Amino acid sequence: MNSVDTVVVGGGHAGLAMSYCLADRGVEHLVIERGDVGQRWRDERWESITLLTPNWATQLPGFHYDGDDPDGFEGRDGYVSYLERYARSFGAPVQKHTAVTRVTVTAQGAYLLDTLSLIHI
């Protein structure tokens, strides 16, 4: 069984932002993502979707918009690319293709995460 004190479930923008903040504070952790980074943006958004805010306002902790169209509105594929670059920028510890199926509390008060890939954390 793998053991880590802090687990973030989901490798989208919120999960990656939390990972950055944990890493910045020296907290060992693992991000578990059911697909690839930004998976929901990859397969659960229309191809034509864009962000509602201009690109210059797109910023995650420690990583501001780095494109060449600050007044534009990033599309789906561009935003996925942004999330991938963000994860790489600080070496986010993402365990990809690992879906969490259950979270239980042990008798000792620890949390046990079961996954489809048979990894217990």
Regions found by a protein language model. Name each.
Residues 112-115:
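SH3/SH3-like beta-barrel fold
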Residues 42-80:
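Glycine-rich active-site loop/strand segments that organize a redox cofactor
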Residues 77-94:
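Helical element adjacent to the flavin cofactor pocket in flavoenzyme catalytic cores
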Residues 96-109:
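A conserved short coil-to-beta-strand element within the FAD-binding core of flavoproteins
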Residues 4-30:
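N-terminal Rossmann-like FAD-binding beta1-loop-alpha1 element of flavoenzymes
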Residues 23-45:
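Glycine-rich FAD pyrophosphate-binding loop
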